[in-house]
Structure formats: structure tokens, C-alpha cells
Amino acid sequence: MSKLSIYVFFFSFSFSFAQDKGIELFNDKKYSEAIEYYKKVLKQRKGDAAAELGLGSSAYYNDNIDLALRSFEEASKSDNEIIQSKALYNIARILQAKDEISKSLKLYKKALELNPSDVDTKINYELLKKMKNQEQQENQDQEGSQEQQ
């Protein structure tokens, strides 16, 4: 599958309920320190979905995709639909990078159902869906031309 660069922010730390120090470390690109900070927060407040989201984002930017995925999966269990939507969006982005397109599309769609006004999710969903449809059309065209030979 051809790669499509989608220029949107991976995660926006605009949650008013997120931890200031973690956001500051993240924004300063001190991802390892942010990871440690969020781990400490989660030891004190297990199940803190905002901290899981912060941990996931910090881990992602620190190239620790496994930790990022686990953290986003935990955050996706939140009762808060905005956090849940952001977590699903981030999982979808990771799966998209792994070429798990069908799973990614399903998660983008679910994130949009939770937060229909999320422009980044809407853009990624539509672009990925278009890319998948174009690829399917190209495959059908190739099969048709091979049959004619």
C-alpha cells in the first residue's frame, strides 16, 4: 500500500483536566521525563484516563509504540467521550502506520461517533477511506487487464 502523509497533529494537549507538569514536559519535548511523570501519576491515581492519554502520547513521541498503544487502549475505556475519542484516534493512527487499514478505519469511525466535531479524525478517516478505495480500484483494474491478456 502506498504511504500517505497526513499532516495533522498526532495529539493535542488541550484538555483542561490534564496534568500541567506532564503537558509542560511534553511541549518541551522531554518525552522520557513526561513518561516518568505520567507513570508516577498513574501509581497514585490508577485509571486516570487523562494521564493514560498523556503517557501514550509521550511514549509515542519517544518511539515506544508498545507503551503508547497500551496507554491509549487504557484511555479508550474512559467514561469521558472526548478522552475516549482521542485515545481511539491515536490507536487508529498507530494501526494506520502498521498498514492495518480496516482496523484503523473502524477506530476512526468510532472516534467520530463519540466526537463528530473532531476535524483531525474526520480528515484522517476520509483520506484513509479514499486511499483504500483508490487502491481497491487499482487492484480491480490490474486484474481486469491481466484477464484481457
Predicted regions mapped to residue ranges:
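Short coil/turn linker motifs that delimit alpha-helical repeat modules in TPR/alpha-solenoid proteins
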Residues: 17, 43-44, 51, 79-84, ...
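Short, charge-rich amphipathic alpha-helical segments embedded
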Residues: 40-62, 115
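Feature detects intrinsically disordered, low-complexity acidic/polar segments
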Residues: 62-149
